[in-house]
Design a protein with these regions (language model features):
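Active-site-adjacent structural elements in enzyme catalytic cores
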Residues: 1-322
Length: 322
């Protein structure tokens, strides 16, 4: 039976003792906040329907929005998938551990709640020492979407998890800020050509050797994502100073995310991001900071849609759509 989470989750530095506690909680059916290289995840035992149901309750997540299952090692794939295609084996060898999720046919005994009722499951091996140690110690596949309320900016710091889900999570392991800052790339790897379902930390360019091709959408893409409690406005870099000045003249509290040379003085919240990689790393934290500082509108300088810039612009458009 799952254990009841405390009224408020605890945050612990990710020591070996804390990791052991987190593993015990996972095995007991509780929810654990887990650092990964992309964003923090809300972890539960992927083989326990009751534990996984707790993720959907905590996040307010639609039941047909499938979860990504995390493994300690590629050798564990057989625990959650029915068949590993040659393409999946090739991509896993090249990109795991790392921010690439492979969609494959789900094993028959994997709970349908984990897959959102779909016949497939997304799987990856994270490239974070705390996540890997937790998975190895727990010795169970872990379902782990981003550890935030659905629709909110994803968490890249342990305190973000507590802010959104503190009453639902038993423990948050603090592994420091997420290194990448945007979610994994999701690829359907069942066929002979990879189909990109979601842009992410591994770029299309990095998948070119495997002939990546565009696809309409991942199952959960129709839902609201990444939106803070303030307006997000996207502008070309050269237009940012004038846009900020015009908005400020109306009396609104204005924030901005842009290269430092474009950030004017007097902003209610300012985040300098000099390139797309830096913007990916800082984006969700910057949106949350703007929100907590009472910003009415945050103006963001767009970036070129190449490399990780595609994933960044995807997240920004969704945030701006509210």
């Amino acid at each position: 039976m799952p254990t009841d989470a405390p009224s408020r989750g605890r945050l612990r530095a990710a020591s070996p003792e804390a990791i052991a506690e987190g593993a015990a909680l996972l095995r007991a059916g509780a929810l654990v906040g887990v650092p990964t290289e992309t964003v923090y995840g809300l972890g539960a035992d992927a083989t326990s329907a009751e534990a996984v149901h707790g993720i959907f309750v905590a996040k307010g997540r639609p039941a047909d929005n499938p979860l990504i299952v995390h493994l300690a090692d590629p050798a564990d794939l057989a625990r959650v998938v029915a068949r590993v295609s040659p393409l999946a084996a090739e991509l896993a060898a090249r990109h795991w551990p790392g921010p690439l999720t492979l969609v494959l046919d789900a094993a028959e005994d994997l709970p349908s709640v984990t897959t959102g009722g779909h016949p497939t499951v997304g799987v990856r091996v994270p490239d974070h020492p705390v996540a890997r140690a937790l998975l190895a110690t727990a010795d169970t596949p872990m379902a782990a979407p981003s550890a935030n309320r659905s629709g909110r900016p994803s968490p890249t710091r342990a305190e973000h998890v507590l802010a959104d889900l503190g009453e639902h999570v038993a423990l948050v392991l603090d592994g420091g800020p997420s290194a990448v800052g945007v979610e994994s790339t999701v690829v359907d790897a069942r066929g002979t050509r990879p189909v990109v379902l979601r842009e992410g930390a591994i770029s299309r360019e990095a998948l070119d050797a495997a002939d990546a091709e565009p696809h309409a959408a991942a199952p959960g893409s129709r839902y609201r994502h990444y939106a803070p409690g303030c307006e997000v406005r996207l502008v070309a870099p050269d237009d940012l100073p004038a846009t900020v000045a015009r908005l400020a003249a109306t009396g609104r509290r204005v924030g901005a995310i842009a290269p430092s040379a474009l950030l004017p003085a007097g902003l209610a919240a300012a985040t300098a991001a000099e390139d797309p990689v830096a913007l990916a790393h800082l984006l969700y934290d910057a949106l949350r900071t703007a929100e907590t500082r009472g910003v009415d509108v945050v103006v963001v300088a767009t970036v070129a849609e190449e490399g990780i810039g595609r994933a960044v612009m995807d997240r920004l458009r969704r945030a701006a759509a509210g």
